[in-house]
């Protein structure tokens, strides 16, 4: 098992020149000491032990795979204890986002959501999809909802197929968002016709979140 001194020596020996400029790309290491010795974790693995999952950046297949795997793992560890999903995302793939959404609804533990920074597009949808009463945002967060984006090229028949699919997805997302916010589907359709940015207080009034957190409860 690696000791604290060995870990620090390893980091020092591998540190590149111009370290200050590159340090932001490093994942911090946490070293815990117990009666059995010392153990090192990257910071995200350590927070996963506290049932905290991070969804940061674009929602794509890789992001979805990581988030889904963590949700399923935490359910297997304790099916009765809440999971917290921290979101700072501009959105992304609808299919990847729906994989996360379906898993959130499928597993037994409640999934609490919290927006820090930005929850836009699919990020906002997943924010609103958390367990009722357990959806939060920090005071300077921004939330943005809009209709799904898409494009098609090729033969007219292929474009028609893609157009039908994106219209189906739009209707499906609007219905789910209405279910989670309490708004009627017609209003959701109007409000998502173009990019619709909200403050955390606006998001609360709209039903996307339940509470704006100024301090940890």
UniProtKB/Swiss-Prot annotation:
E.C. number: 3.4.21.92
Keyword Metal-binding: no
Top-rank lineage group of the source organism: Bacteria
Catalyzed chemical reaction(s): Hydrolysis of proteins to small peptides in the presence of ATP and magnesium. alpha-casein is the usual test substrate. In the absence of ATP, only oligopeptides shorter than five residues are hydrolyzed (such as succinyl-Leu-Tyr-|-NHMec, and Leu-Tyr-Leu-|-Tyr-Trp, in which cleavage of the -Tyr-|-Leu- and -Tyr-|-Trp bonds also occurs)
Sorted UniProt keywords: Cytoplasm, Hydrolase, Protease, Serine protease
Subcellular location: Cytoplasm
One GO-annotated biological process of the protein: protein quality control for misfolded or incompletely synthesized proteins
GO molecular function list: ATP-dependent peptidase activity; ATPase binding; serine-type endopeptidase activity
Pfam family, one: CLP_protease
Main subcellular location of this protein, as a coarse class: cytoplasm
Keyword Hydrolase: yes
Catalytic site positions: 121 (nucleophile), 146
One cellular component term from this protein's GO annotations in UniProt: endopeptidase Clp complex
PANTHER family, alphabetized: ATP-DEPENDENT CLP PROTEASE PROTEOLYTIC SUBUNIT
Protein family: Belongs to the peptidase S14 family.
Functional description taken from the UniProt entry: Cleaves peptides in various proteins in a process that requires ATP hydrolysis. Has a chymotrypsin-like activity. Plays a major role in the degradation of misfolded proteins.
Subunit structure: Fourteen ClpP subunits assemble into 2 heptameric rings which stack back to back to give a disk-like structure with a central cavity, resembling the structure of eukaryotic proteasomes.
Protein name: ATP-dependent Clp protease proteolytic subunit
Organism: Burkholderia vietnamiensis (strain G4 / LMG 22486)
Gene this protein is translated from: clpP
């Amino acid at each position: 098992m690696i000791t604290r001194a060995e870990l620090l020596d390893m980091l020092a020996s591998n540190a590149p020149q111009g370290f200050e400029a590159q340090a932001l790309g490093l994942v911090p290491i946490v070293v815990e000491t117990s009666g059995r010795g010392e153990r090192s974790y990257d910071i995200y693995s350590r927070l996963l032990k506290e049932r905290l999952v991070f969804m940061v950046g674009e929602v794509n297949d890789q992001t979805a795979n990581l988030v889904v795997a963590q949700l399923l793992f935490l359910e297997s560890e304790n099916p009765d204890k809440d999971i917290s999903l921290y979101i700072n995302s501009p959105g992304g793939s609808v299919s990847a986002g729906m994989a996360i959404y379906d898993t959130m609804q499928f597993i037994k533990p409640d999934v609490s959501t919290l927006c820090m920074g930005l929850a836009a597009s699919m990020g906002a949808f997943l924010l609103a999809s958390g367990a009722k009463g357990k959806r939060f945002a920090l005071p300077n967060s921004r939330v943005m909802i809009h209709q799904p984006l898409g494009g098609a090229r090729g033969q007219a028949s292929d474009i028609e197929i893609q157009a039908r699919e994106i219209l189906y997805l739009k209707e499906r997302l609007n219905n789910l968002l209405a279910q989670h916010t309490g708004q009627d589907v017609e209003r959701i359709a109007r409000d998502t016709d173009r990019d619709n940015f909200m403050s955390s207080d606006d998001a609360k009034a709209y039903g996307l979140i339940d509470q704006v957190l100024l301090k940890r409860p």
